[in-house]
Amino acid sequence: MPQNLEPLENLVDQFARFPGIGRKGATRMAYEVMGMSNEQAMELAQAIEHAKKDLHRCRICQDYTAGEICKICLSQKRDRSVICVVESPRDIKSIERTHEYNGLYHVLHGLISPMDGIGAEQLCIKELLARLNDTVKEVIIDRKSTRLNSSH
């Protein structure tokens, strides 16, 4: 790539870091950003900056929240005897859209993958174990491959 397109190549590289985004998709995204007005590009950059600065993990379930504790964990309407363990915060949004589950959640922030050097200590497993007490009667392990499609 010519020297003067290095910033574009860097942008492609950054987008390609996202799971599920290959070089082709990352290149499309980079060109979309380049086609934005300066104002739109700055809004995108600020949205990323604010999300990184203002959101953090709920101290109970590890989902992302602006407060110390997320709305689901604070809700008195949730069934506190059931915890659904999920891989990522995305999974919570997916389950919540079904309106079928009314328990609590716990986000592991990944899966054990010895080939990738990810063991139990890199995940939020000890936080899950700390939540298990006499009020928790059921733990559901959510697996994407077994989740029903909400349109069926």
Where are these regions (language model features)?
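Post-transcriptional modification and biogenesis factors for structured RNAs
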Residues: 2, 14, 130-134
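Cys/His-rich Zn2+-binding cysteine-cluster or related metal-binding knuckle/ribbon modules and their
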Residues: 2-9, 17, 27-83, 88-92
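Short amphipathic alpha-helical interaction patches enriched in hydrophobic/aromatic residues
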Residues: 15, 33, 140-143
